[in-house]
Curated annotation (Swiss-Prot):
InterPro entries: Ribosomal_bL28/bL31-like_sf, Ribosomal_bL31, Ribosomal_bL31_B, Ribosomal_bL31_sf. This is Large ribosomal subunit protein bL31B. The gene is rpmE2. GO terms for cellular component: ribonucleoprotein complex; ribosome. GO terms for biological process: translation. Keywords: Ribonucleoprotein, Ribosomal protein. Part of the 50S ribosomal subunit. One of its GO terms (molecular function) is structural constituent of ribosome. Signal peptide: none annotated. It comes from the Bacteria. The keyword Ribosomal protein applies. It comes from Streptococcus equi subsp. zooepidemicus (strain MGCS10565). Belongs to the bacterial ribosomal protein bL31 family. Type B subfamily.
């Protein structure tokens, strides 16, 4: 196996810029910023979305695609909504 072909894997702190949530994880991501976390200094990587702010994990998910494939098919062929008839 060749040496020095893989990036360095080390602990990195990720900061969710939306919520301010910080978590420590192993990564090869590099950063010039550092942060003090749990008494140690780690590289800091800023992220816009994490499990703390993503709608799927927070339960605040919105369905933006109201006109799906089935709705378009029904509209195209003039079919009534089966649920509305009940």
């Amino acid at each position: 196996m060749r040496k020095d072909i893989h990036p360095d894997y080390r602990p990195v702190v990720f900061l969710d810029t939306t919520t301010g949530y910080k978590f420590l994880s192993g990564s090869t991501k590099t950063s010039k910023e550092t942060i003090e976390f749990e008494g140690e200094t780690y590289p800091l990587v800023r992220v816009e979305i994490s499990s703390d702010s993503h709608p799927f994990y927070t339960g605040r998910q919105k369905f933006t695609q109201a006109d799906g494939r089935v709705d378009r098919f029904n509209k195209k062929y003039g079919l009534k909504d089966a649920n509305a008839a009940k």
